[in-house]
């Protein structure tokens, strides 16, 4: 078992070194928040980029840029200061199952939040304790908070899942990785300081799940919260303080299809 862990560790470290470079950014949805410098712009652009992240990455990036254009490329200012008439431009916006109703609710929730809060981080951390092992309660709180406004549309709930419903929460875990992790390559932002890297849970992308099974990090095939925790624990055996950094390695190799 120790030999297997050692071999897997060497493979993951090698893959991480290969893919953890600024060139990773260009063709990934994380390129969307990288267009901005203001913290709140990064948060809003990052949230939409993460939520839109299923399917072809080029399409995801194009749709994100379309949305940013409708927000005059100033998402924080738009969210904060828009008027009802400004929302008409979104009536034809759609990305797969994410439709106008969903978008308008997102904008409404974000406007409500930023009226009272400096950062979107608090929407997660208000549900957490500093000694929590992971972000499970933060994600559950974010879900409840996101749909606490009157007349919140039921259909939008599928875009903000929660661990309590056994969702792997892939997109939100990816968003948290972007906001929390800080390291030298400049891929992730590290602008949130009240959630620690060791509390993050690995985003369970289809490529990540496949490669994790090939490397025998996990054996299960089902993509749910339990599996996400199992994979994260396996990665903690390799790097207990920053396990989710290996998401970049697993995803990068899975997408590239190249040999180790």
Language-model features: where?
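HhH-family (HhH-GPD) DNA N-glycosylase catalytic core used in base-excision repair
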Residues: 1-260
